[in-house]
Amino acid sequence: MVAADWSWTRRTLLKTSVAGVLCLGEKLFMPRLARAQARVLPEGELWFYNVHTDERLRVRYRNERGQYDLTALDDLNHILRCHHTGEVATMDPRVIEHLNLVQKTLGGEGEIHVISGYRSPEYNALLVKRSRRAVRHSLHVEGQAVDFFIPGVRPREIRKVALKLQYGGVGYYPRADFIHLDCGPFRSW
């Protein structure tokens, strides 16, 4: 009986610690985003469509108190999985928050059409062989990047908003008409 109680306490402690680190880590490692988020985002809600898997997800992954819903984060990981291999990885919450902040700054409406979230190393290597746009050490492989567009919103406008936030990588691909966001150092291309 004592072992079962200890195991339950350890599991609860682990879940609480992970959520706390995610929330605290956001404030420590992304102070600009955390300040902007406090002003702009009452709660974390996103609406996704994966163009490769034909799946949709509308999810509230963080409440107005800043607490993450671990089940919702799992759902986000699933829809942002590697469409080539089906491999699911843990997406960095910072890239999710970056997407949320950009979407809310644009008015908060509109389904985010995902072209690429997580990429397995196998799929990324294939893309590197096929294209000059893919890079060997992509943040997609780390679960720290998303390529997307929002129907009805010009990618140029999304880029402008993302650049004003001065957080992470912001890539604009005018020929393919999509945006890349990541949670690496601030840079643009």
Predicted regions span which residues?
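Charged, often glycine-rich, active-site loop that binds/positions anionic groups
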Residues: 122-138
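Acidic helix-start/capping segments at beta-turn-to-alpha-helix junctions
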Residues: 111-125
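C-terminal segment of N-terminal export signals and the immediately downstream linker at the start
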Residues: 25-58
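Catalytic cores and adjacent binding grooves of peptidoglycan-active enzymes
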Residues: 38, 44-49, 133-189
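N-terminal export leaders
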Residues: 9-24
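Active-site acidic/histidine clusters and adjacent loop/turn architecture
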Residues: 64-115
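Sec/Tat-exported extracytoplasmic proteins
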Residues: 102-106, 110, 122, 152, ...
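N-terminal secretory signal peptides
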Residues: 1-8
